[in-house]
Amino acid sequence: MTTIAVVGATGQVGQVMRTLLEERNFPADTVRFFASPRSAGRKIEFRGTEIEVEDITQATEESLKDIDVALFSAGGTASKQYAPLFAAAGATVVDNSSAWRKDDEVPLIVSEVNPSDKDSLVKGIIANPNCTTMAAMPVLKPLHDAAGLVKLHVSSYQAVSGSGLAGVETLAKQVAAVGDHNVEFVHDGQAADAGDVGPYVSPIAYNVLPFAGNLVDDGTFETDEEQKLRNESRKILGLPDLKVSGTCVRVPVFTGHTLTIHAEFDKAITVDQAQEILGAASGVKLVDVPTPLAAAGIDESLVGRIRQDSTVDDNRGLVLVVSGDNLRKGAALNTIQIAELLVK
């Protein structure tokens, strides 16, 4: 008898988790949903029955003792407070926030890349990577295995859903506010008022913001999204000295993160070799031109536009473009795939 819990079940990623649990026929006899007091008491249809959402603030170790796996997507603050409680009650927690990713005693797992790390549990918690890192890892791991990855230069073009529901609502409202005046931006960037900037530094509608995430106050002038890309890539690939430089850009796309990756390797690797490797890689789909619209709603990371990097000698550099659904594989799906590994 397996019992699974979804914490943050009514949120943006939680909704996708519920859908995927049904689609994948996850082997659970009992499912419990948790959310904040604001959403507690709601009834959600799941597998033909209605399940009442429980108030996470009322949870106790005793009330949680039947749970085997808990999928968390309730934000870092809630995870820090409640994930240890679920773990103490006997559950293995798979957390989608950034709360535990840098903890040396918490494995950071991409199901296709380092699944065996699930056996190294100290705190009863497994961390899910950031959605941008997630898109890249199934692509980079098999290339690393073939040629030895030594350096990454990455630019990411991240959808507004990566900022949560506030990002989605902000873009939709700004597009509506500008309306038919949008073509006036051709000659004047101030031609129309997009309204409230929401969670961003400037209007996102009809714009590109080279500032995704929050500025880290450590003198590097990097955002937390850019540092996550470096730190998480090193941890997942087991390459603590991997050189990673990233610029994370927010773009007016609802779902789907796209990355341009300049990868340098220890050994030569040609475009033909890379295509052959990636064509056989798990969690990867080889296409001519990856786009966020094409990636939205599918499980795989799309990879294409593969070229030799002419700035790296001896055919040791590749340029690739990757697109991935930041809500699906970038968050919900990988969490569930980890849970599937746990209950096998």
Curated annotation (Swiss-Prot):
Enzyme Commission number(s) of this protein: 1.2.1.11
Keyword NADP attributed: yes
Enzymatic reactions: L-aspartate 4-semialdehyde + phosphate + NADP(+) = 4-phospho-L-aspartate + NADPH + H(+)
Sites where the protein binds NADP(+): 10-13, 38-39, 161-162, 326
Ligand binding (phosphate): 101, 228
Keyword vocabulary terms for this entry: Amino-acid biosynthesis, Diaminopimelate biosynthesis, Lysine biosynthesis, Methionine biosynthesis, NADP, Oxidoreductase, Threonine biosynthesis
InterPro entries noted in UniProt: Asp-semialdehyde_DH_CS (IPR000319), Asp_semialdehyde_DH (IPR012080), Asp_semialdehyde_DH_beta (IPR005986), NAD(P)-bd_dom_sf (IPR036291), Semialdehyde_DH_NAD-bd (IPR000534), Semialdhyde_DH_dimer_dom (IPR012280)
Any GO BP annotation: isoleucine biosynthetic process
Pathway entry: Amino-acid biosynthesis; L-lysine biosynthesis via DAP pathway; (S)-tetrahydrodipicolinate from L-aspartate: step 2/4; Amino-acid biosynthesis; L-methionine biosynthesis via de novo pathway; L-homoserine from L-aspartate: step 2/3; Amino-acid biosynthesis; L-threonine biosynthesis; L-threonine from L-aspartate: step 2/5
Positions that bind substrate: 158, 250
GO MF term set: aspartate-semialdehyde dehydrogenase activity; NAD binding; NADP binding; protein dimerization activity
A Pfam family annotated for this UniProt entry: Semialdhyde_dhC
The keyword Amino-acid biosynthesis is annotated on this UniProt entry: yes
UniProt-annotated catalytic positions: 131, 257
SMART domains (UniProt xref): Semialdhyde_dh (SM00859)
Biological function: Catalyzes the NADPH-dependent formation of L-aspartate-semialdehyde (L-ASA) by the reductive dephosphorylation of L-aspartyl-4-phosphate.
PANTHER family: ASPARTATE-SEMIALDEHYDE DEHYDROGENASE, DEHYDROGENASE, PUTATIVE-RELATED
Quaternary structure annotation from Swiss-Prot or TrEMBL: Homodimer.
Family affiliation: Belongs to the aspartate-semialdehyde dehydrogenase family.
Protein name per UniProt: Aspartate-semialdehyde dehydrogenase
Lineage start: Bacteria, Bacillati, Actinomycetota, Actinomycetes, Mycobacteriales
